[in-house]
Amino acid sequence: MVDITRTRERWEKVRTPRAARHSGAGDAENFSGTFAALGRLAYEGAQVSASAVDLNTGRTLLAIDDRIVLPTASIGKLLLLIEVSARLTAREFSGYGILDKTARDAVGDSGMWQHLQAPSLPVADLAALVGGTSDNLATNVLLRQVGLDAVRARTESLGLARTALLDLVRDSRGPDDAPQLSVGSTAELSWLFAALARNEIVDQLTSQRVMGWLSLNSDLSMVASAFGLDPLSHRGVDHDTLLVNKTGTDRGVRAEAGALRGSNRAVAYAVSVQFNDDGLPARLRVLEAMRTVGLDLLEYVH
């Protein structure tokens, strides 16, 4: 089970900022690299969206087409984790309750459970797999347990109008399926991570549990590639840097949202890019641009 107490303690410093070393007359210059990098992608035909807010002040630091709706791939699994955590808090089911994988849940790509022999796992372990490896099979089993309608209702109750988990995970999408696993606006996603970091989503325990699951995330290939953290072990503070994030990857889609705390400040952020993934150079340009966003965020929090 994820240690909720340690998760809470790691984020307590969000409420006690210190004067930043790199602040000047204004902070806009800290994101000049971001504007240039994402601008180049847009010039090449990609759709880009980005948002960042200061966790202590609520101040908007970055807003680039932050209200448009773009595909966000596996980021939508965050909404499922919120619903699962809320039900655990309400004791509608137990974290130790065992769920079986079935043939209709089967799906490939991301995740570990499809490669394991265990036919059944506890609810809390499945949520940890989703948080840690974006496990597709665990996602489908949890969705079967709670229902997509319940996830949608929870999403609406949070006031999210442009962000949604649309479907279960599929190896291929037909004409009768939702065209994307999830969609979202970066403004809403950065707000959501800010609210989670402040323990404001549903209640304190629910928020902390979700942050604990997400702290296991092993995908640091996008924005977080700039933070110098160990992808397999970064639940604690490393060089005064603490990260909790969720990523989404599909053909022509790269998206990331998260919360980052440094020695001086903390931010919630989200970046989405939809692009023509017609070759490795195009994909690498997107990843390099997202890394540039990460470098600007790192500069801001330290």
Task: Report each predicted region and the residues it spans.
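Short, conserved catalytic-motif segment at the N-terminal edge
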Residues: 44-69
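Mid-domain, small-residue-enriched loop/turn segments at the edges of structured enzyme/sensor domains
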Residues: 45-48, 143-198
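A short glycine/serine-rich beta->alpha loop
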Residues: 63-71, 112, 116, 175-178, ...
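Conserved catalytic neighborhood of penicillin-recognizing serine enzymes
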Residues: 106-140, 179
